[in-house]
Amino acid sequence: PHPSGLGSALTHPSITTDYSEALLEFITPVSASIAETERALQNLHLYTVRQLDGELLWNASMPCIVHGDAGIPIAQFGTSNVGQMKRIYRNGLSVRYGRKMQAIAGIHYNFSLHGSFWAEANKLAGNLKSTQALQTDGYLALIRNFFSRVWLLMYLIGASPAVCASFVQGNPSHPLSLIHI
C-alpha cells in the first residue's frame, strides 16, 4: 500500500501514485530553472526515502521481477467519488493493456516559454498577429516537429536497455519471448 508517511495519494500536492501502488509519482512545482527543479526533485526523493522504512526505490523504467498481474496491485485512492473514478480508470487500463504494461515508469514533463519570449518573438515577426496567436501557433509547430521525429527520439532516449524475462513470460507473441538465455 501507499506508505502512510507520504500522505494521501489522492490529495498530496507533490507525491501520488501512478498506476500501481508501487509506482510513485513525484510532482515538482513550476520553476524558472533546471537547478530549481532538480532541487525540488531531490527534496522529494529524500523525504520519500525516509518514509519507506528500508524499502528501496527502483530507478529503472522497466520493472524488475514481475510475478504476474497479482504482483502489480492497482493503486487505491480511497472511497471518494474522485478516488473511485481514478480506480475505475486504472481498472480499464488493466483490461485494455494488461497490468504489466502499466508498471513501466516514465518521465512526464510540461514546459512553457516565458511570456516575454513570445512578446519579443512577436515584435521580431513584425506584430502581424496577436502575441497569444503567435504563442499558440508556436506551440503547435513545436508539437508537429516533435511528432515528425518521435520515432527517432523514442529510439534514442525512450528505449530501455534491459528487460527482465518475467516481464514477457506467458506472452509468446512478444518479440522478446523469442530470446532464450
Language model features: what each stretch is:
Residues 1-94, 101-103, 134, 138-144, ...:
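Terminal catalytic/cofactor-binding subdomain
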Residues 88-174:
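Internal, well-ordered domain-core segments that constitute the primary functional module
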Residues 179-181:
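Conserved small/polar residues in nucleotide/adenosyl-binding loops
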